[in-house]
């Protein structure tokens, strides 16, 4: 079992790091007291091999030797990777002033500046024990995400899951779509009596549409558009992308186009899924 522990000063980006870990398939728990880590790992044994927790100053032991002892009591075979995120007092003060969030150590008689300094002092033992120390003072959330992925995977690349979904406009547009393409202007197999009862998954319909230059040109243009912008979407920390293709009934043209696009992007670079809303609903 792999365990990633994310600690650091409040406002330095722990929640960002935890979201990256969640995208990588880790079971994530925020602000878990260290004495409970062993119980958590026992509960998840056999169901989750990747676990990540974040701890803040309120859950940290005062003595570093207590911390070492707590970690040594974890189940045998636990592979631990630890991060400590930090930023300068000036940057943390600016971030808290902008978000107006309450600092974990803020009290009625303690100013924000004093709370930030106190937290840094309390977390100093932990900062000396971790595997990876990251100063986020000059990092944005994308830079930090890339660093965490680089450390864990050896690469900043993340797997973007692409969903191609066909649908019929007569039944409403899918609300989850990031891109939507209307193919109702393409030649319609519905008007071919022999093809009317079939779907875009059937070979006769596929052959009919493949013979249409307009269909092939439109598919090529969508492919080119997506190929151009996918790298930028990936760098923007997108985990998935839904591309909806709509025709009148969601039976012929949209199904065929969605299938063709899914095949073209199933090249190993991305995880691709295709679903046909109207066909699936008809089976239900």
Curated annotation (Swiss-Prot):
Organism whose genome encodes this protein: Shewanella putrefaciens (strain CN-32 / ATCC BAA-453)
InterPro entries per record: P-loop_NTPase, RapZ-like, RapZ-like_N, RapZ_C
Residues that coordinate or bind GTP: 56-59
Protein name: Nucleotide-binding protein Sputcn32_0712
Lineage: superkingdom: Bacteria
This protein's record includes keyword Nucleotide-binding: yes
Molecular functions per Gene Ontology: ATP binding; GTP binding
Summary of the function given for this chain in its UniProt record: Displays ATPase and GTPase activities.
Similarity-based family: Belongs to the RapZ-like family.
Residues the record lists as binding ATP: 8-15
Keywords: ATP-binding, GTP-binding, Nucleotide-binding
């Amino acid at each position: 079992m792999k365990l990633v522990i994310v600690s650091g000063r409040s406002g330095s980006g722990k929640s960002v790091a935890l979201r990256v870990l969640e995208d990588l398939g880790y079971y994530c728990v925020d602000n878990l007291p260290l004495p409970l880590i062993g119980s958590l790992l026992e509960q998840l044994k056999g169901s989750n091999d990747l676990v990540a927790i974040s701890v803040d100053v309120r859950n940290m032991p005062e003595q570093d030797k207590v911390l070492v002892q707590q970690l040594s009591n974890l189940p045998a075979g636990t592979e631990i990777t630890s991060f400590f995120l930090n930023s300068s007092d000036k940057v943390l003060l600016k971030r808290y002033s902008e978000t107006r969030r309450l600092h974990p150590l803020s009290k009625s008689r303690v100013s924000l500046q004093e709370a930030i300094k106190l937290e840094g002092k309390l977390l100093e033992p932990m900062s000396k024990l971790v595997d990876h120390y990251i100063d986020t003072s000059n990092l944005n959330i994308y830079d930090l995400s890339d660093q965490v992925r680089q450390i864990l995977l050896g690469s900043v690349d993340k797997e973007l899951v692409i969903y191609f979904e066909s649908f019929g406009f007569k039944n409403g547009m899918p609300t989850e779509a990031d891109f939507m393409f209307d193919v109702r202007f393409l030649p319609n197999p519905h008007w071919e009596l022999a093809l009317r009862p079939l779907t875009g998954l059937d070979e006769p319909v596929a052959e009919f549409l493949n013979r249409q230059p307009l269909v092939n040109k439109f598919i090529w243009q969508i492919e080119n558009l997506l190929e151009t912008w996918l790298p930028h979407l990936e760098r923007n920390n997108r985990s998935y992308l839904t591309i909806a293709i709509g025709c009148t009934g969601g039976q012929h043209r949209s199904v065929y186009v969605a299938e063709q696009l899914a095949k073209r992007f199933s090249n190993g670079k991305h995880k691709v899924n295709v679903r046909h809303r109207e066909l699936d609903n008809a089976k239900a």
